[in-house]
Amino acid sequence: MSATKRSTAAVMTALLVACFAFQLNASMLSPALERMAKELKTTDDVIGLTQTVFFTSAALFSLFLPRLGDMIGRRKLLTGMMALTAVGCVLSALAGMTGSVALLFVGRVIQGVAGPTVPVCLIMLRVAVPDPKRYGTLLGVITAVNGGIAGVDALAGGWLAQNFGFGSVFWTMAVIAVLAAVAVAFLTDESLVPGDHRMDWSGTIALVVAVGALLTIFNELAKLSNANFWLVAGLFWLAALSAVAFWIQEERTSQPLVATVYLRSRSTWALLLTTTLTMTGVFAVMNGLVPGLAQNTGYGPGLGTDVVSFWTLTPYAIAGLLMGPVSGTLAGRFGYRKVLRVGLLGTVLGLGAILAISPSATPVLLLAVNVFVGITYAGMSNIMLNGLGVVLSPNDNPGYLPGLNAGAFNLGAGISFAILPAVSVALGSGLDGFQGAVITGLVLLALAFASSLLIPAPAVEKETAA
């Protein structure tokens, strides 16, 4: 432990820079993908696969790195994560100079080590800020940054790629990652779980294989009629057998990655179920279907690709960014579960509004519903789900639930883009298909609200009530 305790302002500065570094890796490339395909003389599908590789890598690292941080020290872990992320960024930038697609894949896999940045930051913040109300507010700030800096990150990525080539995007990411590593190393205190602990690598490998197989299944199913269903079947059995192996390993080892008593607890399975259902219900709607509606010339307003984000994704991100600190403050006063449920109900209403306006959507109406769902989902539900992953964790293993919850976010996003577009295609490519997919999202969100009722009260809420 450090002899001098850092100020909350110093800790927040370091954690925000780290979250910003991760967010750039996740979102800054989106407008540069077409340029990358041209510069590397490859197809859009191959470049899209590099994105899938990054997000899959991020999801898998999220499963166990927070727990590793409990043992070796979270400052040490996060500093190393940022340093490795910078290495991955440099390799990806060099791919642009050498024209090597293989090097780009390697770089993106390494960049995925930044996947659990937000869970690790939230655990470090909780150690630095023990006051529940103040922690709630600051949690909202950090998690809101994770939702994107109001779309500026994507706009900057597009501008850099257009003017200096896609390699400049990765060099920018590398610089920010190095700054984050330095900030975390010098502006935060070390924290870990005291005692003699060993990492359960056998259980970790089994869990990573199981979740990796599931993620690959849903990535494959997203191809719809082009999916390899023999591969899906094989991966299903691999996931099932790995999950069984994981459970057996956790039962038999003296120092499990996650004790089975915790896996059986509602603190674990109810939260993970709620996170997965929420992401499945809303993610593809707001990040795929609604922008698609905005650009549709048949039943939508027919917005161009150059302005569609300003009416959909950007106001959605801004609303979430502004609402985050507010919802965090409300959670500190009224409880995480109450704010989560209000957010989920609001998101159900928001998707209902999208359904209602879809036959005659205008840019202004799209702007309004995106702002509303940005408040209720990005600014409330998403932040409360992240926060609950931290405050529901036991003192002897604070890293396992934030890590599994991060995996649930990624799994839900993958399922969302597999199920909802498939529903849309099955019902036809027109308005009926769009509405059917949104209704499916509504049903899933209603189930998420129902499962949220099973989440037990965190100890911090019990203490506040007492």
Language model regions located:
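12-transmembrane solute porter fold
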Residues: 8-22, 29-30, 44, 88, ...
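Extracellular/periplasmic helix-loop-helix junction of adjacent transmembrane segments
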Residues: 30-61, 100-105, 306-311
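Membrane-interface helix termini in secondary transporters
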Residues: 35, 63-67, 71, 159, ...
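Central cavity-lining transmembrane alpha-helices of secondary-active solute carriers
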Residues: 52-67, 119-123, 314-326
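Conserved MFS/SLC helix-loop-helix module at the cytosolic interface between two early adjacent transmembrane helices
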Residues: 60-99
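Paired small-residue
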Residues: 88-91, 99-111, 364-372
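Cytoplasmic helix-loop-helix junction between adjacent transmembrane helices
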Residues: 110-144
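Hydrophobic transmembrane-helix bundles of small-molecule transporters
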Residues: 162-274
